[in-house]
């Protein structure tokens, strides 16, 4: 499912766009009569009879003027505004939710017999209805003020217009539209518990888009299974989707010309700008590379679709043979294990909505959506998933690893007995300072003393530009004077290499975290109590890597100096422990920006790190260092020049 906001200024125009009977814009289902003539195929209102009566709407079929009035924020009969003006003065608009069936469902709809077509349409309609009911029940779609505070609450119901479509757009190359079952559900208003008609709160809907889309697909898979179709789970991007088992993959690709066209446009963008398009840019590419709907007869479309199916041996009665077949069995881990793995692939914590979305995605074809939500509650009750303060969640497995890391680091921090000595520290500090043509500052000297102390686990905190490199260089020199082995590590190879450049005492002795742990585990690298490991940008280590590293350090008796900044880029996987470890172990903090001597520039750097971007931008603007362009692409181009 995708969600798009229709602004107040475009509300009426968008309504006319969906309601138009002309060839160019979309129209209803692009439905054609048997003889190929466009039909009315009106959209349907999704609202209770009482609400429709309040709005002066008779019957469930949408009449153009009624829809246009609601999208403009007006009562369909009186023309009076239904709600207050927003911050920009607008009163109309809405949210367009597009529920698009998997390509195999559209293929069976297009190529199957009349009964299969009806079954696909009915399953799709039921799934959309279930998803909308779930949205109304679980997503707060009303925003109001209490005692000066803005709060979100659930609506009694929403008012929406539903349009049924069965084809995608044609492509610029001239090909006709592919089969693509989808429905636009345009939410125009919400009804508060007190009965007042108000605007829809869009942000909660956008936050819940993945969950509602997953609920729709789960419901659709359940509907299809009830009708005798087998489901193949784990298809599409990140394995979040499903297809009907038995439909040739090559056919699905052949019936996806529009998707290929957008993908080619994205590749051209990547070639020009050296990066993938962001969400807004991708939406613009879709608009730039779309062709108006071309109304051709159903018979014409059927000939093209049948010819395409024949190339993949899926013509004739092949679609009807899908009924009753079984999907190829694939060895899989237990559902709960799969869910936990997906949830913590990229972060140690997650939103409750993401938890439900992942469970719905992973259980497609295995559980109904209601059963999946029951399982989500059971996983919380069994403490496999743990609610945290602030509304986030984590898994018991991740928390257990975090606790193991904290326990190990606390042990390292309390294990003393090896100190490089004040003489070695002073000599190393002088040599490192001489290399940069100056002296160590008071906070740098203190940091050097802390990280060369007797504890086996210590932390050095400091943002970029505070002179961490010279402190690490001095510390490594001091350790080497005592006959100790020194190694530098980082998550990425480039960071490890830069560590050796910024701290010459570690030159030729740096490697990635993964390489160090792997070599130690396989006996290819020996580390012991006479080894000190300097871990740069430690905040970028995910929990699994940190777990293996601290275990290796604990078992070998070596020393670990973790260096980083809690405000830097986070880990790629589940992580975020650096700040917590700094509370456990002896820590030194570098806060003075040494990259510039200008106090105003130093304050601007500190403001950026602390999230006070308005202050930093004001400073850069006052210095003429802030340059504005109309678009992101123009800004990138000017920066490159």
Predicted regions and their residues:
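Structural recognition of the conserved hydrophobic beta-strand(s) that form the central parallel beta-sheet
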Residues: 488, 559-565, 589
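Hydrophobic positions on the alpha1 helix immediately C-terminal to the Walker A/P-loop
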Residues: 471, 475
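Interdomain "pre-motor" coupling segment immediately N-terminal to P-loop NTPase/helicase cores
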Residues: 357-426
């Amino acid at each position: 499912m995708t969600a798009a906001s229709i602004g107040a200024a475009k509300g009426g125009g968008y309504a006319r766009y969906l309601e138009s009977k002309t060839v160019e814009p979309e129209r209803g289902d692009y439905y054609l009569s048997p003889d190929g003539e466009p039909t009315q195929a009106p959209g349907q209102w999704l609202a209770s009879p009482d609400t429709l009566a309040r709005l002066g709407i008779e019957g469930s079929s949408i009449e153009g003027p009624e829809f246009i009035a609601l999208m403009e924020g007006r009562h369909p009969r009186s023309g009076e505004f239904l709600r207050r003006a927003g911050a920009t003065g607008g009163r109309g608009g809405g949210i367009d939710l597009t529920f698009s069936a998997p390509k195999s469902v559209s293929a069976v709809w297009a190529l199957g017999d009349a009964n299969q077509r009806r079954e696909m349409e009915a399953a799709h309609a039921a799934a959309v209805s279930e998803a909308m009911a779930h949205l109304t029940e679980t997503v707060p779609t009303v925003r109001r003020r209490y005692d000066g505070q803005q709060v979100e609450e659930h609506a009694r119901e929403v008012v929406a217009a539903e349009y049924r479509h069965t084809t995608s757009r044609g492509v610029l190359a001239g090909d006709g539209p592919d089969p693509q079952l989808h429905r636009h559900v345009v939410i125009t208003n919400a009804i508060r518990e007190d009965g007042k008609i108000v605007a829809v709160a869009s942000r909660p809907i956008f936050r819940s888009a993945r969950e509602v889309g997953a609920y729709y697909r789960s419901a659709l898979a359940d509907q299809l299974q009830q009708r005798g179709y087998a489901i193949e789970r784990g298809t599409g991007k990140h394995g979040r989707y499903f297809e009907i088992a038995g439909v040739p993959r090559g056919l699905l690709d052949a019936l996806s010309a529009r998707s290929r066209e957008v993908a080619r446009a994205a590749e051209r963008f990547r070639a020009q700008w050296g990066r993938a398009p962001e969400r807004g840019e991708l939406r613009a590419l879709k608009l730039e590379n779309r062709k108006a709907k071309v109304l051709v007869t159903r018979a014409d479309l059927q000939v093209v679709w049948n010819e395409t199916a024949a190339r993949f041996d899926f013509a004739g009665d092949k679609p009807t043979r899908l009924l009753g077949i079984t999907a190829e069995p694939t060895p899989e881990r237990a559902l709960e294990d799969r869910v936990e793995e997906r949830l913590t692939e990229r972060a140690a914590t997650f939103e409750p909505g993401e938890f439900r979305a992942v469970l719905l995605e992973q259980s497609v074809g295995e559980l109904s959506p209601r059963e999946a939500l029951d399982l989500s509650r059971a996983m919380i009750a069994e403490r496999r998933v743990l609610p945290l303060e602030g509304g986030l969640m984590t898994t018991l497995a991740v928390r257990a690893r975090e606790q193991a890391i904290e326990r190990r680091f606390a042990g390292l921090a309390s294990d003393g007995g090896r100190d490089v000595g004040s003489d070695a520290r002073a000599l190393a500090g002088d040599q490192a300072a001489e290399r940069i043509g100056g002296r160590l500052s008071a906070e740098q000297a203190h940091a050097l003393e802390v990280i060369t102390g007797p504890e086996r686990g210590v932390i050095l905190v400091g943002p970029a530009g505070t002179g961490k490199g010279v402190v690490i260089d001095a510390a490594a020199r001091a350790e080497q004077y005592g006959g100790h082995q020194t190694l530098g590590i980082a998550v990425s190879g480039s960071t490890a290499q830069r560590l050796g450049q910024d701290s010459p005492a570690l030159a030729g002795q740096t490697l990635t975290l993964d390489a160090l742990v792997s070599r130690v585990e396989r006996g290819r690298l020996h580390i012991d109590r006479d080894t000190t490991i300097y871990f740069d940008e430690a905040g970028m280590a995910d929990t699994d890597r940190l777990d293996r590293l601290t275990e290796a350090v604990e078992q070998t008796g070596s020393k670990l100096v973790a260096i980083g900044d809690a405000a830097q880029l986070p880990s790629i996987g589940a992580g975020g422990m650096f700040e917590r470890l700094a509370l456990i172990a002896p820590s030194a903090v570098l806060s003075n920006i040494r990259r510039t001597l200008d106090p105003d520039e130093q304050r601007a750097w500190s403001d950026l790190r602390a999230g006070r971007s308005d202050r930093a931008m004001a400073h850069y603007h006052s210095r003429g260092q802030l340059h504005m362009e109309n678009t992101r692409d123009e800004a990138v181009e000017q920066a490159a020049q």
